[in-house]
Curated annotation (Swiss-Prot):
Keywords: Cytoplasm, Glycosyltransferase, Purine salvage, Transferase
PANTHER family xref list: ADENINE PHOSPHORIBOSYLTRANSFERASE
Classification via InterPro entries: Ade_phspho_trans, PRibTrfase_dom, PRTase-like, UPRTase/APRTase
Keyword Glycosyltransferase: yes
Record field: catalytic activity: AMP + diphosphate = 5-phospho-alpha-D-ribose 1-diphosphate + adenine
Species assigned in the record: Cereibacter sphaeroides (strain ATCC 17023 / DSM 158 / JCM 6121 / CCUG 31486 / LMG 2827 / NBRC 12203 / NCIMB 8253 / ATH 2.4.1.)
Official protein name in the record: Adenine phosphoribosyltransferase
Length: 178
């Protein structure tokens, strides 16, 4: 029996959402029980023996991964959401998109000063959303001790961007090209 890698579970959709884009669809990974379990195991592997107070996930697929990782670690989960999606008091950070600006938010009491946080998402492209998430966590006094992704798109520079912030970046696989 041959064993599939995480990359083998990810489908590529050509020309989505725009012509010339190769969309890396991780929903096929999530749909396969074995593939999903392998992904969670591998996301956690570099952090064996480390203690986290919280896991933060970026909207939306980071919620799926982050929830599973938090469950495995027996810790709390913090959703980092698009503006206007969280009830109650929040703090926000804006970041640049290719055409315009976006804003992410977190509850202002989601992370306590000094808590160690693992940031999780499905895909690292330019790193803008992850950087905004890191800034939110740090504004609350949390310490991001790792950033874990299923897919890295190295040609878009996200890893370099996060590493320039002093972040440890872990990705299960990389896809070259756009």
């Amino acid at each position: 029996m041959t064993h599939k890698s995480v990359r083998d579970y990810i489908r590529t959709i050509v020309d989505f959402p725009h012509e010339g884009i190769l969309f890396r669809d991780v929903t096929t990974l999530f749909a396969d029980p074995r593939g999903f379990r392998i992904a969670i195991d591998q996301l956690l592997a570099p952090y064996a023996g480390m203690r986290f107070d919280k896991v933060a996930g970026l909207e939306a697929r980071g919620f799926i991964l982050g929830g599973a990782v938090a469950h495995r670690l027996s810790t709390g989960f913090v959703p980092i959401r698009k503006k206007g999606k969280l009830p109650g008091r929040t703090i926000s950070v804006s970041y640049q998109l290719e055409y315009g600006e976006a804003v992410v938010e977190v509850h202002d009491d989601a992370i306590q000063a000094g808590e160690k946080v693992l940031l999780v998402d499905d895909l690292l492209a330019t790193g803008g959303t992850a950087e905004a998430g890191i800034k939110l966590i740090e504004q609350l006094g949390g310490q991001v001790v790792g950033c874990a992704f299923v897919v890295d798109l190295p040609d878009l520079g996200g890893r370099k961007r996060l590493e320039a912030m002093g972040m440890e970046v872990h990705a299960l696989c990389a896809f070259e090209g756009l």
